[in-house]
């Protein structure tokens, strides 16, 4: 009958175990292996701390069998690996989950803001014709409105009419805006240029006006 002496860590009294009667012919006695819960409960403080990744010496440094000393590094590695996985999971749950929730909230809020801006644009839709010349409104404010609406479009200005044409070749939308004779001076003062021969859009449309000067505000579009 074989007797096995082993210590869970240096400095603790060895534990003596005796194998069962049918184990006399076993060359290497099988030591008692505690469960993981027992090992962690009996381990030094670094093992019991679930927030630390610093580990003490192996739980099973050696097993004595007479004059033979055998190493159980593989078992030590297995226990350390399990413990490291548990600590890693706890750290992920403690740190990464709140960070993920915060990031998800920021992305959701950004998506909501973008959706609101897309549904309620500042400029009026190009698919409808609308009169921007109510009675009593000055010419300066009307031209300011033209400059705000003309994003990514070419604008043609005559002394009597302003038309906004989309630069998309497939669709040309016209917003009729009445402009009086001071449009000429307004555009010249701001260096936006004049033309009397017509201006060609990206869609291939040429527009000429006989008897009236034609002005383009494409520089602000």
UniProtKB/Swiss-Prot annotation:
Tagged with keyword NAD: no
Membrane-spanning parts: 100-120
One Gene Ontology term, aspect cellular component: host cell Golgi membrane
Region Disordered, annotated ranges: 1-22
Keywords, sorted A to Z: Host Golgi apparatus, Host membrane, Membrane, Transmembrane, Transmembrane helix
Membrane topology of the entry: Single-pass membrane protein
Compartments (UniProt record): Host Golgi apparatus membrane
Positions of short motif PPXY motif: 44-47
Keyword Lipid metabolism (UniProt): no
Top-level lineage group: Viruses
Family per record: Belongs to the varicellovirus ORF0 protein family.
Miscellaneous comment in the UniProt entry for this protein: The vaccine strains V-Oka, VariVax, and VarilRix harbor a mutation in the stop codon that extends the ORF by 92 aminoacids.
Subunit and partners: Interacts with host ITCH; this interaction probably mediates ITCH degradation.
Domain notes: Late-budding domains (L domains) are short sequence motifs essential for viral particle budding. They recruit proteins of the host ESCRT machinery (Endosomal Sorting Complex Required for Transport) or ESCRT-associated proteins. Contains one L domain: a PPXY motif which is involved in the interaction with ITCH, a member of the NEDD4 family.
Protein name (Swiss-Prot/TrEMBL): Membrane protein 0
Organism (species): Varicella-zoster virus (strain Oka vaccine)
């Amino acid at each position: 009958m074989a007797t096995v002496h082993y210590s869970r860590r240096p400095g603790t009294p060895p534990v003596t175990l005796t194998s069962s009667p049918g184990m006399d012919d076993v060359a290497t006695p099988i030591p008692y292996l505690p469960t993981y819960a027992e090992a962690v409960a009996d381990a030094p403080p670094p093992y019991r701390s679930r927030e630390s990744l610093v580990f003490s010496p192996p739980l099973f440094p050696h097993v004595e069998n007479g004059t033979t000393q055998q190493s159980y590094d593989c078992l030590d590695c297995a226990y350390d690996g399990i413990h490291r996985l548990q600590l890693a999971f706890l750290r992920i749950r403690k740190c990464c989950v709140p960070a993920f929730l915060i990031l998800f909230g920021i992305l959701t809020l950004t998506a909501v803001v973008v959706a609101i801006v897309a549904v309620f644009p500042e400029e009026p839709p190009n698919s409808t014709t609308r009169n921007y010349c109510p009675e009593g409104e000055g010419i300066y404010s009307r031209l300011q409105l033209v400059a705000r609406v003309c994003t990514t479009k070419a604008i043609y200005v005559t002394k009597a009419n302003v038309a906004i044409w989309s630069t998309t070749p497939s669709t040309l939308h016209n917003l009729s805006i009445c402009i009086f004779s001071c449009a000429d001076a307004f555009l010249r003062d701001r260096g936006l240029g004049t033309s009397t021969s017509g201006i060609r859009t990206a869609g291939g449309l040429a527009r000429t006006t006989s008897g009236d000067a034609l002005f383009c505000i494409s520089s602000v579009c």
